[in-house]
Regions:
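DUTPase catalytic domain/fold
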Residues: 1-179
Length: 179
């Protein structure tokens, strides 16, 4: 493919996972129920278990289930299927981010900045990206392009009022804390 930008891919040595081994039930930990994120492959033959780069990493890297070409330009975002469905624990959501190295090295941006997946969504996770570079980008199967973050939600009551208090040290404009 002439003029295309290819991402370097390190082959992941993983066998396709047994779907049943990925589904975990809630477990008891010292009298409390432990929440479990359940991950299910869309196609078990093309599934690679999401991984953390380090033990303390916040996000799980997701491996692409198939090759994708992202054309250059901002006319239409490219939809990329992540090959997984999830059952998200109650009180949580998932945030989908680009890996920082992908954004830096290949000039991709997510069309909506961050993908937010609600706990009641059960379909395949997808992301939409734009290619800001000068050439199409070829993403390879097993490439770590996106990462997912399990995010605890704070549900609050919303009250609509006619006015709000002025009791604050901040000004009333963006950037009001200084430059």
């Amino acid at each position: 493919m002439e003029g295309a930008l290819f991402m370097r891919v390190k082959k992941v040595e993983q066998e396709p996972q047994d779907t049943n081994s990925l589904i975990e039930e809630k477990t008891e930990v010292k009298g409390k129920t432990k929440n479990t994120l359940k991950i299910c492959p869309v196609n078990p033959e093309r599934f690679y278990t999401p991984t953390k780069g380090t033990e303390k990493a916040t996000c799980y890297d997701v491996y692409l289930p198939k090759d994708v070409i992202v054309p250059r330009g901002l006319q239409n975002p490219t939809q990329i299927a992540l090959g997984i469905k999830m059952e998200i624990p109650k009180g949580y959501d998932i945030r989908i981010h680009l890996r920082s190295s992908v954004a830096r090295d290949y000039h991709l941006i997510m069309a909506n900045s961050v993908g937010i997946v609600d706990e009641d969504f059960r379909g395949e996770l997808t992301a939409y990206v734009y290619n800001l570079g000068n050439y199409p980008i070829f993403l390879k199967e097993q490439q770590r392009v996106f990462q997912i973050e399990l995010h605890k939600k704070d549900n609050v009551d919303v009250e609509f009022v006619s006015d709000i208090s002025e009791d604050t040290e901040r000004g009333h404009e963006s950037g009001s804390t200084g430059r």
